[in-house]
Amino acid sequence: MVRLLSVALLALGLVGGMVAAQGSQPDALKQLENKGMPQLMAQLAKSKTCTNATMRIRKEWGDLPGAERKRYIAAVLCLSQRPSHYSPSVCPGCKSRYDDFVAVHMEFTPTIHNTGNFLSWHRHYTYAFESALIKECGYTGAQPYWDYGRWAQDPLNSPIFDGSDTSMSGNGENITHKSTVSPPGDGGGCLMSGPFKNMTVYLGPLASTADPRPKANPQVNGYGSNPRCIQRDITNYLSSRYGRTQDIVNLITKNNAIGPFQTAMQSTSGALGIHAVGHFVHGSQDPGGDFYISPNDPVFWLHHSMIDRVWTIWQSQDLSNRLMTIAGGTSMFGAGTRLQSLDDLIDLGNVEPTDKKWKIRELVSIVDGPLCYMYQ
């Protein structure tokens, strides 16, 4: 059995990862991932819905060849050109299928942040986006992720933010601005380069942290049409302090229960967690600094794929005890709300990729239920 697992792992190219393949030792996070991989593979062997043949393999953006990055970028832009599934009377600012994903996140934000379903909801949400790229835009790859630790010291010059045609676009124009989460950098304005330079966002703002604030939405609920650019102010201030590989490793190894783990990840215990770091590496600018509408910035999907990867690695360290476990309430406002249950349903509105709503317990594994992918 052990030999069969080893062969399967090697066949999928999941052990060691790209870093080791290039001749160096895998970093501490990859070592944890490798340690837990046999448990995931054993679970895959028992799955009735996921096989090696149907599995998607998610890779770090920097490990993707330029051609693969361009295919992903093209699919995201394709989704921003496809028609919305919302009625204009319900969501006037939903101009595209991409906007549908933003609107759904806006709708459910109070019940999917600092809650017991934070990880499972965003896991399925990211899978839904990945599925839309495949089914609606002909994408043949998987959702990439952003390994914060790998680029923590210099995110601006990383393959993710270097502004090239194979990046997720770079910094914003240098404008006078303040920052509410870290010292202001040399950006702050509209994207200056890269594939998403001319992308227009319409929804929000709702809870902007930008200063100066973006123009108000014509509707109180943020669903009105409010065209504007994507702004960024990329610095290493947060990533070099709180988003290093060791910070992620500490998150995984020092929190044995799901409650403390997700509390530390979401920064709800006072210290800055990696969830906040990923959102604010590009500053408190609009739209990324507004947690209701943060999916308006396409780098959101790489960020939350990494959040999901970290959860997966944490689970795999003790899968039998860390799979069917949950903690937290059902509202980010806390007081008076009931505790979340594994039998609660995950609602994705009109971006649900299947024909049903799934229970949280059906989404705790990445190789069972509707999900079928692994990280490399």
Residue spans of the language-model regions?
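Fungal secretory targeting signals
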Residues: M1-S24
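Intrinsically disordered, flexible peripheral segments
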Residues: A20-Q376
